[in-house]
Structure formats: structure tokens, C-alpha cells
Regions:
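Short, solvent-exposed coil/turn segments at beta-strand boundaries
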Residues: 30-36, 52-59, 77-80, 148-150, ...
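C-terminal structured interaction module
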Residues: 158-207
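Hydrophobic/aromatic-rich structural module bridging two neighboring secondary-structure elements via a short loop
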Residues: 42-87
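A structural detector for short beta-strand units
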Residues: 23-27, 47-51, 70-75, 143, ...
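Beta-strand secondary-structure signal
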Residues: 37-39, 50, 63, 152-156, ...
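Secondary-structure transition/turn motif
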Residues: 40-44, 64-68, 87-90, 156-162, ...
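N-terminal ordered "arm"
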Residues: 6-51
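Solvent-exposed helix/loop surface patches that form functional interfaces
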Residues: 1-24, 72-154, 158-159, 175, ...
Length: 207
């Protein structure tokens, strides 16, 4: 079952603004090498991320950039629940996880929303890799996703004992996350040829 229509090969982009208007979060999605590459910014943390996903929105790699041209954190999975760093270190505490969660962007919730084959009223629980941008701490937290209706999802954090209902568009992209973000722009973007090239040509931080 497919929840939302497939995105076109020309890609997709979105910008969200924090409800206080102080920060923006962006994502640009490109189709390449039989999968999706998401390049995003975290305005509140002055950081950038890259998430490499399969055609079915399964996370394969995650890169986080803060102050350096090289990634501060680079995680990858073999597609069977085993996680490690790109230097070869096996992160056993992450094994079995499927998704990445970043506090500073609604996009990491778009990934399970588009991937999970849920009917209205159904739920799915899974362990999520939660990353603290400031400290680079990586913690596994259980979350539950429930599809309320065609354009509304609820996700519940067992660790925080709280839930959030978000509104999504026809593509499953978050348009409104109460008390956190509201989407201000959405557009189709051009095709990128090489995802590593995106890393090399990602926008430089201003001093």
C-alpha cells in the first residue's frame, strides 16, 4: 500500500519557519542513483544535514555538518537494522532502528509518514535514532505514529510522554506542527546528478 503519490524525478523542496519566526529549516530532495537524497538546514542550530534514502524511503545514511567541511557525524545502516559510523565502528546500541529524528526540522517526521503503510486509525511503533545537534549525543527512543485521517498524523514520544498532531499535504509533507513549525514555501526542484557532489557544493556558512 502507498500512502501518498510518488514524487517526480525532478525532486521536491520545502521551507519551514519556527512559530516564533526566529529560525528557518529547509530541505531539498533529489532523486539519484535509485534513491532519494535530502539536503537540509537547521537554522536554530546553524547546522546542515544530508539523509540518503532508498526509493521506499528507508534511511541508508545520515551526515551532520556543523562547523567543519567534513561531517561531524556520519552514520550508515546495512538495510537490515545494523548501524555503524563510516569509519567502521559498529554502533550496537542503534541496531534495529529505522529512522532518524532531528528536533530542528519537521522533515525527519515526513520520512516515516511517507513510508509507513498505515490506514486511517492505525498505528506503528518503532525505535528512532534521536540526535542532539549541540553535543552529538545519539539516543534511541521509541515513538508511535498514528494516521488520524488523510492529512493528519500523530506521533507519540514514550520518552517524553507527549504527543504531537501534525497536518500534512497531498505528498505527506508537514505543513503545520503546532507550537513548533509552519511551512512557508514548497516547490519542485531540479535534478542533481551526484549526491556526493551536493556535499562538496553545499552552501558555505557565513562567518
Amino acid at each position: 500500500m502507498v500512502n501518498y503519490p510518488a514524487l517526480g524525478p525532478s525532486g521536491h523542496s520545502a521551507t519551514w519557519k519556527s512559530v516564533d519566526g526566529a529560525h528557518e529549516s529547509t530541505v531539498s530532495l533529489q532523486w539519484e542513483n535509485e534513491g532519494w537524497t535530502a539536503n537540509g538546514t537547521l537554522g536554530a542550530d546553524n547546522a546542515q544535514f544530508v539523509i540518503r534514502m532508498s526509493a521506499t524511503w528507508m534511511v541508508q545514511q545520515f551526515l551532520l555538518f556543523r562547523d567543519l567541511e567534513e561531517p561531524d557525524l556520519w552514520l550508515a545502516t546495512d538495510g537490515h537494522g545494523r548501524w555503524g559510523e563510516m569509519n567502521g565502528a559498529h554502533r550496537t546500541e542503534l541496531d534495529g532502528c529505522v529512522d532518524i529524528d532531528l528536533r530542528g526540522t519537521p522533515f525527519t517526521n515526513v520520512i516515516p509518514i511517507r513510508r509507513l503503510p498505515l490506514l486511517v486509525g492505525h498505528s506503528a511503533q518503532q525505535n528512532v535514532i534521536t540526535i542532539d545537534i549541540e553535543t552529538l549525543a545519539v539516543v534511541v527512543k521509541p515513538q508511535m505514529y498514528t494516521r488520524i485521517d488523510e492529512h493528519t498524523w500523530r506521533y507519540f514520544s514514550f520518552a517524553l510522554d507527549c504527543d504531537v498532531e501534525v497536518t500534512v499535504d497531498e505528498h505527506g509533507f508537514v505543513t503545520d506542527e503546532p507550537n513548533s513549525f509552519i511551512r512557508v514555501t514548497e516547490s519542485v526542484v531540479g535534478i542533481a546528478n551526484d549526491w556526493l557532489g551536493l556535499l562538496l557544493h553545499r552552501p558555505k556558512k557565513s562567518l
